[in-house]
Amino acid sequence: MKNFNLTHRIVMAPMARMRSYGNIPQPHVALYYCQRTTPGGLLISEATGVSETAMAYQNMPGIWRKEQIEAWKPIVDAVHSHGGIFFCQLWHAGRVSHQDCQPNGESPVSSTDKPFADDPSNEFTPPRRLRTDEIPTIINDFRLAARNATEAGFDGVEIHGAHGYLIDQFMKDSVNDRTDSYGGSLENRCRFALQVIEAVSKEIGPDRVGIRLSPFADYMESGDTDPKRLGLYMAKSLNRFEILYCHMIEPRMKTVSEIFECRESLTPMRNAFNGTFIVAGGYTREDGNKAVAEGRTDLVAYGRLFLANPDLPKRFELNAPLNK
Ligand SMILES: Cc1cc2nc3c(=O)[nH]c(=O)nc-3n(C[C@H](O)[C@H](O)[C@H](O)COP(=O)(O)O)c2cc1C
């Protein structure tokens, strides 16, 4: 990976913990990340909110306030002291939120005002469609959050463009029903994502920027009628900005946890993108090795296996038994 001296290809996938009380990461999280750090290993943080309106769920961390930046510093330092490379995943939940998580109890914002079709326990508040003139403010929130992440010491940021959150709500045609320059054609639907990438890259340098995408997933009612075209368009467009990496979720992961039989592959996107490619979703030691050996990816991110096995790289090296 350009400018980073990785010693192996096993990446810790971003995983929300929901233990950041008051949206401030707590000191105990340093231990959690350090347990999963190896010298020259890449870790991606839990989803971290870029602003007050970005938030959802309980106790997710943020990185828009001074207090949050200060709280991240010793955590990032701890990972660095173990030789790790640490990227902060920048997140805006969009409509996957509830008014109780929003400033002044307002509706969450989205590309649309469509509520979830299937939300029996009213987990989510119907969203308010962002006006075209409000969109630059959200892009600016990502830019400032990236600056804050570098101030906190992170080596770079991963823009969360996956899993039905705000950026995905713009990209996917089942969600985005806009009629302005951010809706309709594929080019228009991807405009927001690409403007975020551009702003963040200009702020901290493209060599410190990655993005996570899940064109094939329909998690949080975020399916697309032509995911291959979407994934390919994004992979090609990213080259304009020369960002560090593109992290894609395997088509077999329709949600974040269920694995489906699937014939689709990420190879066209991998071939279209010029930077480092990372895959994630249901990988084992064996098929991770196979994906690398066959040239289908550069790096493989592991989620649940890393959660249950903090020393995952060592266990893979020894081919040792794994905790479930
Ligand atoms: C507890 C948990 C929290 C997660 N939180 C995030 C997150 O904050 N951001 C994200 O992009 N993906 C998140 N994911 C998805 C994982 O990064 C990963 O893509 C998924 O678990 C599939 O990979 P795996 O089969 O190796 O676990 C989460 C998954 C789990 C299990």
UniProtKB/Swiss-Prot annotation:
Disulfide bonding pattern of the chain: none
GO molecular function, one term: FMN binding
Annotated source species: Arabidopsis thaliana
Protein name: Putative 12-oxophytodienoate reductase-like protein 1
Binding site for FMN: P14, M15, A16, A47, Q89, R212, G282, G303, R304
Modified-residue entries (N-acetylmethionine), positions: M1
Keyword Hydrolase: no
Binding site for substrate: H160, G161, A162, H163, R252
